[in-house]
Amino acid sequence: MKLTFLGANHEVTGSCTLLEAAGQRYLIDCGMEQGKDVYENQPIPVAPGEIDGVLATHAHIDHTGLLPLLVRNGFRGRIYATKPTAELCSIMLRDSAHIQEFEAEWKNRKGQRSGAEPVEPMYTIQDAEAAIALFRGFDYNKEVELAPGLVIRFVDVGHLLGSSSIEIWVTENGATTKLVFSGDIGNLHQPIIKDPTYLKDADYVFMESTYGDRCHGPKPDYVGELAKILQRTFDRGGNVVIPSFAVGRTQELLYFIREIKEKGLVKGHGNFPVYIDSPLAIEATRIFRDTDPDCFDEATRALLAQGIDPIQCPGLRVSVTSDESRMINADREPKVILSASGMCEAGRIRHHLKHNLWRPECTILFVGYQAVGTLGRTLIEGATDVKLFGEAIEVRAEICQLTGLSGHADKNGLLAWVNAFSPKPKRVFIVHGDDEVENIFTQTLTDEGFTACAPYNGAQWVIGAEGAVCVQEGTRVRVEHRPSEGASRAATVFQRLVSAGKRLLRVIEHNEGGANKDLARFADQINALCDKWDR
């Protein structure tokens, strides 16, 4: 079998690995890069139409966001995931496509004035719908045979509703090898969802390392800390604006706010309004409510058994339309605004930042990881002004973080997860971490007695009876400058053309042995197309 590391190697976003085994080709995740591009993701070395399927570890866009593009370029296989992941992707991929279309439309309106070449979205709502139709959802802990010699199982990893590690059994030449892809390993004691499941055996492990160089410390008093932030901000007459990931983090915060209101922890503002200003978050909250309770932790199941909705509180309001969103900032009553995206790169949160960043009485509260190069990271690093919608905005609001609130395991959590394997895996491949973090965590595992390495994007490894051998090193050339938007779009469109060419070649090979009359007509059509475009 062969594995090609395509994305999220020595960086955190854009997860994608190609597994070629038992005569099949499967991608494990197909994610979009977000924030600063450190190492260029490598193109998939085969035409999308030649890929048999995709295994999705969870619904976050940095793990699934390029699935519509894969379909646009010719992929027609199945996408395998847990049932909650399939449900969440049905809303998240539509939302991502909407953002792609909106941004392309905005750039084209702006470009008309300067005579710029029109741009097209990376993918469309139609592409997202086509990808969603390919999903197949499964329960946890159920073995699924993808093909003879290829069996998988999803195991709860406690990162997000529906998140999973994926066990893969590959049988070739009468010998079975077990791979485990960790997915994003969850932090302990998160509200609503269960803690990560520890697996016992694997030959080769592919594990994330987001926080492989640090410890979260003792579990914070999330409810108490959040209540203090709300109290001092409301006492100043300001809003608490929370850039929040629509799926997972928003529901956790609603869980905390319900408890704050239930216990009366904010004095003098007991009925403060809480706005969910994200259509995606509203839909995600509905999916959380409709999910099988077996996916939730013991405390959440206990609340449900008492008839208590764990993510509902007095004063909760939702904003679906753009007009409803605009009205939030017209209301001067102190309030909580939960809006996406969590890293402030897109979505309605940018409008709320524009209206609240310059107000010293307000607080911008970050509650999740902020990738290098994102607006969120810029703000927590102390920027004094930022540009939003072409306008310079002075940063006068209080900027703070709810520390320790993370969906990712820290160094100790990662070590607990990997140390559960007995005996130790033959090799651990470290992925999904910032450049230096991957190096540090690889050394940590080496010191613990593991054989570990951190491949770069483009690396290829062959696994056989003799073990794992690197047959191609990945690229270590850093991206010094993000390519221009136009160049990036052009590269995407050209890649579609290349994929179409590869698909055409497959169709030609498939027609070998056909009737001469049909083959001649097919050849004439191809030649006519070539004559038209050979310029």
Question: Which residues are covered by each model-predicted region?
Answer:
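His/Asp/Glu-rich metal-coordinating catalytic cores
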Residues: 1-55, 60, 64, 69-252, ...
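Short, compositionally biased "basic patch" segments
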Residues: 191-206, 293-300, 370-396
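Short, surface-exposed amphipathic charged segments that create phosphate/polyanion-binding patches used
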Residues: 150-154, 287-295, 415-416, 465-475
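Generic long, charged, amphipathic alpha-helical segments
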Residues: 387-418
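A polyampholytic, Gly/Pro-enriched intrinsically disordered region
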Residues: 100-105, 292-306, 469-495
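Hard-cation-handling environments
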Residues: 229-374, 387, 422, 437-439, ...
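A general structural motif
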Residues: 185, 218-223, 314-324, 343-345, ...
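Conserved acidic residues
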Residues: 52, 203, 335, 362, ...
